[in-house]
Amino acid sequence: AANRKLKPMAEYEQLDENFDKAELTSKLSNLYVQMQDCWQKKDISPIRPYCTDAFFTQMDNQLQRKKQQGQTNYIERIAVLSVELRGWCQEGGNDVLVARLNTRIVDYTLDDKTGKLISGSRDKEKFMVYEWDLVRTTGTKTEKDKPMQTVNCPNCGAPVEINASAKCPY
C-alpha cells in the first residue's frame, strides 16, 4: 500500500450505503484471532474463504513443514489492540481497502514428542503490526444484516472478547 494513493474511507461509505467501519474492524479483529487459532490447530481450512490463493498456499506449505517436523506453533494471549482502516483505492476492477492491525501475542514452537521449546518464548509478548489488503469486485455492496462468525472459547463456548487477553474468563 506504500505506493498507492489511498482515498478516505468516508468516500467509500458514500459508494456503499450499508458499509459500516465499526462492523468491519470488529470482523477483522475476529478474523485475526481465528487465523491464529487455526494456525495452532494446524488446520487453516476454516479461514480459506478470506485468503487469496497465494496467501493460503503459503500458509498451508508452512503448516505442512511444521507437521512433517513434528512441531506445533502455539499462539497465546492473543489481543488485537487496534484496527485502523487506512483508506481505499481501485485496482484492476477491484476495490482494495487497506487495514492496519496492531496486535499482541505470545508465540512459541514446541516439539510434539518431547515438549521441548524449539523457538519463541512462553512468556514474552510480541507486538506485531499487519497491513491487510481487503479486496472485492468494484460495485459489490455490503449485505445488510449478514451474520458475523465470532470466536468462542473451545472449552465452555463463551464468546471470547477480542480486544482483551483472549483467555476465557469463565
Positions of PLM-derived features:
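Core segments of small alpha/beta cavity-forming domains
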Residues: 2-76, 165, 169-170
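Short flexible coil/turn linkers enriched for glycine and charged/polar residues
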Residues: 41, 90-95, 125-128, 147-148, ...
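Surface-exposed, charged secondary-structure patches
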Residues: 69-113
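Hydrophobic/aromatic beta-strand elements that line small-molecule binding cavities or substrate pockets
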Residues: 83-85, 130-134
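Mixed-charge, low-complexity intrinsically disordered segments
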Residues: 112-122
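Cys/His-rich Zn2+-binding cysteine-cluster or related metal-binding knuckle/ribbon modules and their
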Residues: 142-151
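Short cysteine-rich clusters marking metal-coordination/redox-active sites
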Residues: 153-156, 168
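Cys/His-rich microdomains that often coordinate metals
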Residues: 157-164
